Amino acid sequence: MVDRIEGLGPLSQSGKTQKKSENNFSEALKEALEKVNDIQKKAEKAADDFAQGRISNIHEVIIEAEKASIALRLTVEVRNRIVEAYRDIMRMQI
């Protein structure tokens, strides 16, 4: 015998889950951008301190600048991937 197909559960519950995941993603993105900004500020401060003679070790300045450069490149690449995924979704036919 064939079993009866049960109805779907309430739709409002899935909306709550989606809202929660949206908040998690937006919060994670915000925190990541704040970290990149902090790294950029730290590199800029190290360069200023070196220029004013407060830091004598150029290696520290170069390391901070490279960290900032890598963080920025990674951020740009993540943004590019997000935009690409959004465009792919927008091109999908329903």
Swiss-Prot record:
Q: Where is this region: Disordered?
A: 1-26
Q: Which Pfam families match?
A: FliE
Which controlled-vocabulary keywords does the entry list? Answer: Bacterial flagellum
GO annotation terms (biological process): bacterial-type flagellum assembly; bacterial-type flagellum-dependent cell motility
Specify the superkingdom: Bacteria
Q: Where in the cell is it found?
A: Bacterial flagellum basal body
* Record's keyword annotation contains Protein biosynthesis: no
What is the predominant subcellular site recorded for this chain? other
* Record GO terms (molecular function): cytoskeletal motor activity; structural molecule activity
**UniProt GO cellular component terms:** bacterial-type flagellum basal body
Q: Which HAMAP family match?
A: FliE (MF_00724)
Family named by the database record:
Belongs to the FliE family.
Q: What is this protein called?
A: Flagellar hook-basal body complex protein FliE
Q: What is the lineage of its organism?
A: Bacteria, Thermotogati, Thermotogota, Thermotogae, Thermotogales
